[in-house]
Amino acid sequence: MHSSGGFQKAIHGHALLLLLLLASGAETFRICAFNAQRLTLAKVAREPVLDTLVKILARCDIMVLQEVVDSSDTAIPLLLRELNRFGDSGPYASHSSLLLGRSTYKEKYVYLYRSHEAEVRDSYMYDDQDDLFTREPFVCWFSLRSKVLPSLVLVPLHTTPKAVETELNALYDVFLDASGRWQTKDVILLGDFNADCTSLTKKRLDDLVLRTQAGFHWAIADGVDTTVRASTHCTYDRIVLHGELLQSLLRGAAAFDFPQSFGLTEQEALNISDHYPVEVDLALSWAVHGVQPPCLATLWLSLLLPLLAPQLGLVA
């Protein structure tokens, strides 16, 4: 029979083992959005810019790029090629919208995603019959290697600063359209919403349908700075989650301060973008490997039973 001290040490050791077991399943699935500020082939071809972009992208399982203005369709293939050469982060694939906009200036939405973790199940350009959006959302339904969350829908939007309120209220209709089309509640709205500072006052922000309607969680909270310049402090870029299951899997949300992480000066960072990427982490790792997360009580019992059996006289 264990002595009291020995038993306590054994309990302590098994508790540590339990934590290690739980931690081994604690890797997360990261979804990001990044306004890459007028991304062209000329910009991507600059080595310092390309290197930094690759390091930013390699942190994400799914990335939605905005302000891709490359009409030659060569910038993303170059970026994708270098991303797939970077360490063991890949393989990545891409899925792009058409060029969008009302004038000669047009942008694309581009999804970059780890193809062994996610795949595009379906996608469509929102039918903006009332022409409320300057760049209508390019909605994408992803299948995930997860039994916890087999699929989710992403709805990106880069608003125009002069019509932020109109576009963000119309984004609720896009949510309803996508949710109804694919019969899912697990939807993420994300992108450069311009949802702060002079583009959208706090009062107007709080009156948005996406703020007053129940069921939406603004993961990138008000007050988080998503801008690179030291002279600005605005929460322009947002990620909004809908769906109880999806929200229950949220483990973190942040703006990624890439200048600080990569040791860049402000000017060096501005060569990349004047925005930080924003990101959410979802706890899908057990399911990514095809295994459901074990119940905490089950883990405790499996670890403690060998210790408790002698104490309870259960040993034959």
Curated annotation (Swiss-Prot):
UniProt keyword annotations, A-Z: Disulfide bond, Endonuclease, Endoplasmic reticulum, Glycoprotein, Hydrolase, Nuclease, Signal
Region forming the signal peptide: 1-28
Disulfide bonds: 197-234
Glycan-bearing residues: 271
Catalytic residues of the enzyme: 107, 158
Top-level taxonomic group: Eukaryota
An annotated GO cellular component: endoplasmic reticulum
SUPFAM superfamilies named among the record's database cross-references: DNase I-like
InterPro entries, sorted: Deoxyribonuclease-1_AS, DNase_I, Endo/exonu/phosph_ase_sf, Endo/exonuclease/phosphatase
Biological process per Gene Ontology, one example term: DNA catabolic process
GO molecular function: deoxyribonuclease I activity; DNA binding
Keyword Transferase among UniProt keywords: no
EC primary class: hydrolase
Sequence similarity: Belongs to the DNase I family.
Protein name per Swiss-Prot or TrEMBL: Deoxyribonuclease-1-like 1
Species this chain originates from: Bos taurus
